[in-house]
Amino acid sequence: MRRILFFWIVTVVIANPVFVGAQNFSDRFAKGNTSFGGELGFGHTFNLPPGKDRTDLSFAFIFPNWQKNLTGIIAPDSLMQGALYWHVEAGLALLTHRDHEYLIGFSPLMVNYKFLNSQRKWAPNILVGAGFSMQDCEEVAHYELGSEFQFLLHGGVGVELFRESGTYSFNYWLFHVSNAGIEKPNIGLNSHVFTLGFRF
């Protein structure tokens, strides 16, 4: 299965032409440009901080998003050359191997920095931000989640692959869910999330 997935990824990366020939580098990453996209992936909870064993939960991660370039190309001709994006997303985390309990989230306070280079057709990126959600997982994770309303914290890294039209990305996120002490208990859940993203 891993070999098939690896082969598919390599095919996607190689089969399409580099974006630079179709569109000027600075135009593509101009300040004010916007795009829609999405993240599809899988997550699993883990013990952070270490201590009492947390509830084991696995979930599908389905989050459409919107981005706006806030800066255009900054720090030119340096290792930090890139662009800062406002990132807004809303979507669904659906538990697997349970009764399909869910979390519906909205995160309007996120930023994504892409390390850009006109000689590459890919860019590493960093994403951080916050949002809020409603969920019905408190019965299966009562020790960690004491209320339906929860806050969300996101932090992650990825690699974005540029195509003539649109992009693909491969990402890792740390996904934190807690209610900030509104109700007890408030241990919270932390998850590793791996996603495949796309933009158009």
Could you tell me what each predicted segment is?
Residues 19-69, 192, 197-199:
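Short glycine/proline- and aromatic-enriched beta-strand/turn motifs that initiate or cap beta-hairpins
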Residues 65-69, 76, 112-116, 150, ...:
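Transmembrane beta-barrel domains of outer membrane proteins
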Residues 21-34, 70-84, 116-124, 163-167:
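Short loop/turn motifs that connect adjacent beta-strands in outer-membrane beta-barrel proteins
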Residues 1-30:
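Cleavable N-terminal export/targeting peptides
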Residues 32-34, 56-62, 100-107, 122, ...:
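Residues that define the transmembrane beta-barrel architecture of outer-membrane proteins
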